[in-house]
Amino acid sequence: MFQDKGWVLLTLITLVSPSWAAYKLQERYSWNQLDFAFPNARLKEQALASGDYIPQNGLPVGVEHFGNRLFVTVPRWRDGIPATLTYINMDRSLTGSPELIPYPDWRSNTAGDCANSITTAYRIKVDECGRLWVLDTGTVGIGNTTTNPCPYAVNVFDLTTDTRIRRYELPAVDTNPNTFIANIAVDIGKNCDDAYAYFADELGYGLIAYSWEQDKSWRFSAHSYFFPDPLRGDFNVAGINFQWGEEGIFGMSLSPIRSDGYRTLYFSPLASHRQFAVSTRILRDETRTEDSYHDFVALDERGPNSHTTSRVMSDDGIELFNLIDQNAVGCWHSSMPYSPQFHGIVDRDDVGLVFPADVKIDENKNVWVLSDRMPVFLLSDLDYSDTNFRIYTAPLATLIDNTVCDLRNNAYGPPNTVSIPKQTVLPVGPPLYTKQYRPVLPQKPQTSWASSPPPPSRTYLPANSGNVVSSISVSTNTVGPAGVEVPKAYIFNQHNGINYETSGPHLFPTLQPAQPAGQDGGLKTYVNARQSGWWHHQHQG
């Protein structure tokens, strides 16, 4: 039937390749339950007996890498959390389930010792000046059980000396009774003193800016973009349906410095499928807190099942973000329009990436992802005989390879024009200039998995049998009356664009090899092995 037997073999390999072939994130550490590095066995036994340490009550939520240390935060949502800011010595523990070491020491993790310690930390950030930024929420408990023994305080540590070099309490005017801050972004300008931190007030619906040089903070709160979308409060994770309808501004990322000397802050409310943005020129100016409404820009929705809590952008403009409904990590290259065909999925795993709570890119452009099954922990019961918490890593270049986010080898690139910036309510402008790309490839390169050894830590999903595949539906762009394209949002990247369902490549190569008689000749079907985000191409008769 087929004259080219080699083509048949390649197609069969694509269809029946084992599930590990789709994975690029590699598991580095994992735990059934968290363990801590007590000074000695006797003190650990005392903590277990007194309830100061309850292994089943710990949930990791934040991760950050610096040198030979991998930092992990454990909020004090329940009793029995001996330390909230911890790290793994990566020289001593290359893999496995290492004990978490309190940072910088045990005393600095004493709950309620406001001036000297950290009570609860969530997501943290290391800047390029070797400083670790930690916001202590000062809280114990979660939801209705929350108490506030300490005020919100910014803590900054010098990672070369492991000493705290700054503690700044947020003034009462910068918070409100509903304030809950779980995310931080750090903006370094001309030098290490020209530093700002931005804090997302998820339940108080505000954005707080802090100046290192001035040692002062101010709050932006008069903006509806910080609020949840009332239509996007329904969640489905790990088979659990729940409603987080009050969750406002949450995930944030910062662009590289623009030509005007400022960055762009991108952010999303948790109960939303939409991304927003604002220049740090506005956020750095205390006088603009009540007079900046029109300086914030709305991008369109990402599409269904696209809630996100964490995002990060590399210094060359590649944004990674978690997709908690999809057990996946997505990507977008910020030099491209913010539209669905320029969003990709770099990895998906319905076992290992259940609630990928935090995503980071370190100084060496390695990506770190922490998954923790948070909704199961909060709303149901974890099985502590199973692996519940994982930390994955991979080089950024490896993750985006052969995705729409990899512009170095992208046969599915956009038209070589950039539009005049417009708000979403205005028509798309004419081309401003021609954007230069590398020559378009005649055909998307095929990836051969046959010679790749399976990663030993990613073998828990069974392989497909026969030629069974899972299909992915690709949403089309929205059009208005008479086929006119809906105006797209623009934000500091010289493009109009929307964000819809994360999807695979949106265009086919213009040049196709000759096909046997009776075949269509085009690349007709995107298929997805083991529900991963990596696209495998096949010809169908």
Curated annotation (Swiss-Prot):
Glycans are attached at N144. The lineage of its organism: Eukaryota, Metazoa, Ecdysozoa, Arthropoda, Hexapoda. Residues 1-21 form the signal peptide. Its main location: secreted. It is found in: Secreted. Belongs to the major royal jelly protein family. Controls the pigmentation pattern of the adult cuticle and larval mouth parts. It comes from the Eukaryota. Gene3D superfamilies: TolB, C-terminal domain. GO terms for cellular component: cell hair; cytoplasm; extracellular region. Keywords: Developmental protein, Glycoprotein, Secreted, Signal. One of its GO terms (biological process) is male courtship behavior, veined wing extension. Pfam families: MRJP (PF03022). The keyword Signal applies. The keyword rRNA-binding does not apply. This is Protein yellow.
